[in-house]
């Protein structure tokens, strides 16, 4: 019958396990973050398709708005949340789409940019987004109304403005600012201006 493990043997096994974890953990965390980015991009793509469908069915200008200002009551919203709303032809907020609530990106994932050209990927200026004015939600915003970035679909199903490239990637909102991480490895959601078609890609 084999004797019990000695203290030295147990310590050796634990040491080996710690070394293996130290080697594999960074790779595991990187893989997990990458999966979160891909998941967020697909969720946004699906939501954009639903918003477009609502616009066509109800014959109303309908937008997916992202919180891109700092006039908020909680830091959980900027660059990490989105919601469907109805706007008019001048991009002015009218009301929230019935039964729609704020939805959030996976932890550690944000919308890094909305560009209107592939050359403008990830500049962080949101130049390809529509500015939706008079957005109102007393439970979210500290101001009575705000202006936020979004994608607007006309009642015909095509997009207000030029093609839009939504850049989803790693990042966080801290100390009143959006901090982007690993910008070379982002997921792209493309919305075609003329057809409203939503497609995916990577930078």
Predicted regions located by residue number:
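Alpha-helical hydrophobic helix detector
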Residues: 11-27
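Positively charged n-region of N-terminal signal peptides that target proteins for export
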Residues: 1-3
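N-terminal helix-rich module
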Residues: 5, 23-49, 53, 61, ...
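Carboxylate/His-rich catalytic cores and anion/metal-binding grooves
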Residues: 8
């Amino acid at each position: 019958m084999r004797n019990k493990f000695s203290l030295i043997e147990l310590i050796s096994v634990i040491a080996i396990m710690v070394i293996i974890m130290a080697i594999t953990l960074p790779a595991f965390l990187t893989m997990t973050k990458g999966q979160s980015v891909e998941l967020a991009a697909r969720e946004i793509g699906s939501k954009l398709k639903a918003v477009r469908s609502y616009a066509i069915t109800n014959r109303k200008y309908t937008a997916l708005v992202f919180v891109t200002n700092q006039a908020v009551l909680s830091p959980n919203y900027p660059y990490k949340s989105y919601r469907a709303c109805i706007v008019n032809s001048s991009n002015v907020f009218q009301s929230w789409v019935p039964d729609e609530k704020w939805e959030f990106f996976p932890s550690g994932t944000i919308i890094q940019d909305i560009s209107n050209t592939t050359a403008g990927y990830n500049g962080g200026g949101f130049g390809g987004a529509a500015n939706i004015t008079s957005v109102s939600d007393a439970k979210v915003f500290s101001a009575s109304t705000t202006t936020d970035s979004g994608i607007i679909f006309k009642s015909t199903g095509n997009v207000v403005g030029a093609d839009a490239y939504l850049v989803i990637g790693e990042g966080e909102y801290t100390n009143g600012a959006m901090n982007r991480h690993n910008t070379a490895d982002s997921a792209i959601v493309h919305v075609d201006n003329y057809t409203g078609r939503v497609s995916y890609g990577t930078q």
